[in-house]
UniProtKB/Swiss-Prot annotation:
Repeat region (LRR), residues: 112-133
Species of the source: African swine fever virus (isolate Tick/South Africa/Pretoriuskop Pr4/1996)
Signal peptide: 1-16
Induction, per UniProt: Expressed in the late phase of the viral replicative cycle.
Alphabetical keyword list: Disulfide bond, Glycoprotein, Host endoplasmic reticulum, Host Golgi apparatus, Host membrane, Host-virus interaction, Inhibition of host innate immune response by virus, Inhibition of host TLR pathway by virus, Late protein, Leucine-rich repeat, Membrane, Signal, Transmembrane, Transmembrane helix, Viral immunoevasion
Glycosylation-annotated residues: N32, N39, N44, N76, N82, N101, N181, N185, N219
Domain remarks: Contains putative leucine-rich repeats (LRR) and a C-terminus cysteine-rich capping motif similar to domain structure of host TLR3.
InterPro entries attached to this UniProt entry: LRR_dom_sf
Name the UniProt record assigns to this protein: Transmembrane protein I329L
Regions that span the bilayer: 240-260
C-alpha cells in the first residue's frame, strides 16, 4: 500500500508540473449584473486581453487573472492589451499579469470607466497625469502590491502627491501602497514595495528632496503642476468664456450707441433753442405777390428757395376770384 501511495504521489506531481497555467477571464453583463467566464488562447506566443471575438458587444467589463506569471515569462509568452475594446468597458480588472507600465492600457481608459483594478502586477512607473485623471473622475482605482520605482521617472509623481497631500494622501493606500499587518501590535504601515518602510508623508518628503538633489534637470515644479492642473480644468470652458465676452462686448456697444444718440439729440435741441434763427421747414415756402397786376390770373409766384427765381404761373381758385372782384368794387 505504501508503494502504491508513493506511486500516485509522484504521478500527481508530474501531472501538475505539465499542466499549463490558466488565465481566468470573465466579462460582465450589466443587464443581469453577472460575470461570465470565457477561454483565453495563446496564439503565436501572445495572449491578447481582451481576446478577439470572445466577448459580446454588450459587455460592460472585463476581469482577467494570471495564475502563474512565472510560467509565462519563462516560456516567452507575452501579453498584449486591446485598448480599442477596453474603451468600451466600465470595469477593468487585470490582476497578476506582469503589467509594468500603466500606460500600456491608459489609452483604453474611456469616460465611462467606473472601476480599475491592477493589483499584483509589476507596475514600475505611474504617470502623474494618469493618476490625476483617475482621481478627478472619482474612479475607484487599486494599484497596490506593485513594484513602483524610486528613480527619476516617478519624480513628477512625487511632486504632485506632495503638493496635493492634504487631498490625495488619504487615497494613497487605495492607489499604489501596500498594507503590512504586524501581528505583534496589530498596526498597519503603508509604504512602497521597493522604497523602504516609510509612511506616506515622510516618504514623499524624502523622495522629493532626493529628486531635486539628484535630478535637477527635471523642471516640473509644484507651481507648474498646479498651473497645468488649473489650465486643464478650465480648458473645456474656453468656448463659453469666449461667447460670454463677445455678448458683453455687443451689449456694451449697443448701450454706447444709444447713449451717443441721446446726447446728440439733446445737444442739437439746446443749440437750436439758443439761436435767434427761425426754424426753416423742409417744405419750400412760396411767397405770393400781386405786384401791379390787374388780373389775378397773371399773378406771379416767387420761389425763394431757388437762385434763379423763375416765375411760376399761379391759377387762383373761384373763391379767390370772388374776393378779388369784391375788393375792386
Amino acid at each position: 500500500m505504501l508503494r502504491v501511495f508513493i506511486f500516485f504521489v509522484f504521478l500527481g506531481s508530474g501531472l501538475t508540473g505539465r499542466i499549463k497555467p490558466q488565465i481566468t477571464c470573465k466579462y460582465f453583463i450589466s443587464e443581469n449584473n453577472t460575470w461570465y467566464k470565457y477561454n483565453v488562447t495563446i496564439l503565436n506566443g501572445t495572449i491578447v486581453l481582451p481576446a478577439y471575438n470572445t466577448i459580446p458587444s454588450n459587455a460592460a467589463g472585463i476581469s482577467c487573472t494570471c495564475h502563474d506569471i512565472d510560467y509565462l515569462q519563462k516560456n516567452n509568452i507575452s501579453i498584449h492589451y486591446n485598448t480599442s475594446i477596453l474603451k468600451t468597458f466600465q470595469d477593468i480588472r487585470i490582476i497578476r499579469c506582469g503589467m509594468k507600465n500603466i500606460s500600456e492600457i491608459a489609452g483604453g481608459f474611456g469616460k465611462e470607466l467606473k472601476f480599475l483594478d491592477l493589483r499584483y502586477n509589476d507596475l514600475q512607473v505611474i504617470e502623474y497625469n494618469i493618476l490625476r485623471k483617475l482621481i478627478r473622475s472619482n474612479t475607484p482605482t487599486y494599484l497596490y502590491y506593485n513594484n513602483l520605482m524610486c528613480g527619476k521617472r516617478n519624480c513628477p509623481l512625487y511632486y504632485f502627491l506632495l503638493k496635493q497631500e492634504q487631498t490625495y494622501l488619504k487615497l494613497l493606500p487605495q492607489f499604489f501602497l501596500r498594507r503590512i499587518n504586524f501581528s505583534n501590535n496589530n498596526t498597519y504601515l503603508y509604504h512602497f514595495l521597493s522604497c523602504g518602510n516609510k509612511p506616506g508623508h515622510e516618504f514623499l518628503e524624502y523622495q522629493t528632496k532626493y529628486c531635486r538633489t539628484k535630478f535637477p534637470e527635471i523642471n516640473i515644479t509644484v507651481n507648474q503642476l498646479t498651473a497645468k492642473k488649473n489650465t486643464e480644468r478650465y480648458k473645456s470652458c474656453y468656448p463659453l468664456v469666449f461667447i460670454s465676452i463677445l455678448c458683453s462686448c455687443i451689449s456694451f456697444l449697443f448701450l454706447f450707441i444709444c447713449l451717443l444718440r441721446s446726447i446728440c439729440k439733446k445737444y442739437s435741441c439746446t443749440k437750436q433753442g439758443k439761436s435767434g434763427h427761425n426754424y426753416i421747414p423742409l417744405i419750400p415756402s412760396y411767397t405770393f405777390s400781386l405786384k401791379k397786376h390787374r388780373h389775378p390770373e397773371t399773378a406771379v409766384v416767387e420761389d425763394h428757395t431757388t437762385s434763379a427765381n423763375s416765375p411760376i404761373v399761379y391759377i387762383p381758385t373761384t373763391e379767390e376770384k370772388k374776393v378779388s372782384c369784391s375788393r375792386r368794387k
